[in-house]
Each structure stands twice: as C-alpha cells, then as structure tokens.
Amino acid sequence: MKKMIAILLSVLTVLCMCACSKDEPRTETKTDDYTPDYGELYYASGDTKFGIMDPAEEVLNALGEPVNGTFESDSCAYQGKDYFYYYDGFEVMVNDVDGVKRITGITVADDTVQTPQGLKIGMKLEDAQALLTGEYKQVGDVYKYTQGSTVLKLAVGDDGTLTAIEYAVAANDK
C-alpha cells in the first residue's frame, strides 16, 4: 500500500510540474523578417533561387522531391542533425538554426550543372575568377570568396580546373 501511495504521489508531482510549465504558443516565426545577405553568391535551379541561411521549407518545396534521395546524420557544426537532399547535379544541406530549418550548404555535385555565376566543375580557375567579383582568400588549393553570410569555395586540381564548388556558412569557415 505504501508503494502505491508513493507511486501516485510521484505521478501527481510530475503532472503538477508539467501543468505549471510555460508553453507559450508560437504566434510568429523567425522567418518573417528574414532578408538574404548572400549578395551574388546564391544558387538557382530552374526558377528557384536560394542561398545560405534561407529558410529551407519553401526552397525544398519549390525544388520538389529530391531525385537522388535524402540522408541525415548527426551534426558536428549544429545541434541535432544534418539533412542532405540530393538533386540532379547538386546537393542541399539543411540544419536547425535557432529553431528554423535553414540551408547551410549547397554543393555542385558534377559537371552537368552551372551556377548562376557561370561556374562549372571542370572549367579553368582563371575563367572562374574572371566571372567573380571581389577578393578571395587562397588556402592550399581552395579559393574562397565571401559575401555576407556565404563563403563560396572553389577547389582546384593539379591541372588548374575546378574540382569542387561549394556554398557554405561564412561564420563556420574558420
């Protein structure tokens, strides 16, 4: 009988604590006042233009079902998971940033697509640099262009051609 009373008291205590907690309804979203700050460093697929830190939900809806699937893994840079969406020629990475799922990475996967800036895997570095404005920072074989929240990374092979093109969060690029 004493065990039963102890269990009931424990359950009642938990219920009381839950009832007293503040769970305020969400009347606003953190995307209402969002303004992109990636300048000319954005990506586009069809009529859908998007960039780093854009709210992911509307972009993913506009892009449609990822033709090459999705993947998720534990995140090293953010709390929670990394979500990857694989489309023809490019990949989109999404993370939860301050309660909003945002685009945190865009990677050109192969030479079947071209960025809005005119960049394409396999093109000569000199040709790519002629298409981009602003200064860059070279770290080994990677050339980094930064505007606002975005860093555009161009990896170059031994033959002087682009081997990788990636848009990433500038704050994470240390």
Predicted features along the sequence, with ranges:
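N-terminal, intrinsically disordered, polar/charged segments of Gram-positive cell-envelope systems
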Residues: 6, 22-63
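Short acidic DE-rich linear segments
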Residues: 24, 172-174
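A low-complexity, Ser/Thr/Gly/Pro-enriched, surface-exposed linker/loop concept
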Residues: 104, 108-115, 121
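Short, surface-exposed ligand-recognition loops at beta-strand->loop->(often short) alpha-helix junctions
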Residues: 48-52, 116-121
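C-terminal motif of bacterial Sec signal peptides marking the signal peptidase cleavage site
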Residues: 15-19
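A cross-family detector of function-defining hotspots
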Residues: 35, 45, 56-98, 120, ...
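Positively charged n-region of N-terminal signal peptides that target proteins for export
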Residues: 1-4
